[in-house]
């Protein structure tokens, strides 16, 4: 069996095209395909539409309704934990990945050429602000976390059941998922593709969500910011000692305090700002530790439905 995990949030108007795309994938394979739809607290009619018998589905499906919006990565993690296939694909509901990419990702694993296959964007059609944020974030993540991660990030991937089982055992924060794909090892392959322009709606991946994801993923996978803080502390200490020695000699030789009240105040301001930044970084790590030790689930399932193919209605 092949499983396709699709997180759903405000995707009501994308569902007809999504089902058509998934039906095309089913047509490509002779073995059974299941689709795991994880409705991430979506406020629209997505859950009802996916149950509708008016839309012809050539595949079995699981409909997992979460109790609220936990975030796309939490929904993906829930889908991975519940998928039953020997190969599991994770894709978005916006249909911006070509069907041939899905089949290529699966074929790499089915034909035993890889354990993890990752779709890598060759181009980005996003707005300027999104492209800039993405470029900065992934550059930082590659620098601090893992430089094997693609420059444009990861949106779609497939993995074998063996890899999925290892990710379940790790049970890390959902924000660490992309990093885990490159941390767990195994045979990995990347497949380039040109992303299709979004036809309907707009991304719900807001700046606030991106910022939270950036902080969570970096604190889950890198201790480099703490090293930077240590370096900053050493540099600040050296500067402070140098200034103290300068003031002391100035008073011993000229018997007066050195001029320059403004530079001193500015220096204090810079040091205080550095300290506040350091406290913020430490706080982010402490919060990540606190979140992980609480043992709360990454999501809560409110309802689950098992649906068979309704091909007979066509």
Predicted regions and their residues:
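Hydrophobic helical membrane-anchoring modules
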Residues: 176-314
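Residue-level signature of catalytic and energy-coupling elements of molecular machines
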Residues: 22, 79, 94, 117, ...
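Solvent-exposed polar/charged
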Residues: 55, 81, 107, 134, ...
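Structured catalytic core of nucleotide-sugar glycosyltransferases
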Residues: 1-126
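Residues in soluble alpha-helical coiled-coils and helical-bundle/repeat scaffolds
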Residues: 9-13, 96, 100, 168, ...
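Acceptor/aglycone-binding surface of glycosyltransferases and processive sugar-polymer synthases
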Residues: 66-68, 72-82, 99-175, 197-215
């Amino acid at each position: 069996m092949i499983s396709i995990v699709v997180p759903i949030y405000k995707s009501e108007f994308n569902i007809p095209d999504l089902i058509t795309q998934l039906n095309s994938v089913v047509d490509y394979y002779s073995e059974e395909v299941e689709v795991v739809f994880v409705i991430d607290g979506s406020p629209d009619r997505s859950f009802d539409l996916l149950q509708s018998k008016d839309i012809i589905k050539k595949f079995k499906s699981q409909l997992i309704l979460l109790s609220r919006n936990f975030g796309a990565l939490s929904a993906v993690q829930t889908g991975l934990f519940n998928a039953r296939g020997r190969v599991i694909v994770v894709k978005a509901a916006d249909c911006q990945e070509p069907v041939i990419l899905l089949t290529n990702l699966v074929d790499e694993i089915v034909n035993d050429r890889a354990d993890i296959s990752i779709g890598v964007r060759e181009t980005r059609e996003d707005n300027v602000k999104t492209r800039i944020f993405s470029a900065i974030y992934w550059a930082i993540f590659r620098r601090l976390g893992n430089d094997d991660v693609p420059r444009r990030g990861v949106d779609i991937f497939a993995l074998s059941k063996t890899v999925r089982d290892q990710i379940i055992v790790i049970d890390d924060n959902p924000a660490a998922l992309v990093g885990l794909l490159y941390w767990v090892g195994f045979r990995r392959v990347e497949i380039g593709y040109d992303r299709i322009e979004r036809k309907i709606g707009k991304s719900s991946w807001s700046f606030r969500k991106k910022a939270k994801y950036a902080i969570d993923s970096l604190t889950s996978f890198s201790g480099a910011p703490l090293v930077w803080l240590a370096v900053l502390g050493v540099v600040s200490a050296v500067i402070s000692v140098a200034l103290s020695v300068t003031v002391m000699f100035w008073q011993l030789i000229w018997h007066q305090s050195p001029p320059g009240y403004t530079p001193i105040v500015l220096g204090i301001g810079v040091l205080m700002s550095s300290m506040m930044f350091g406290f913020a970084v430490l706080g982010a790590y402490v919060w990540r530790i606190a979140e992980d030790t609480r043992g709360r689930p990454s999501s809560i399932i409110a309802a689950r439905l098992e649906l068979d193919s309704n091909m007979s209605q066509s």
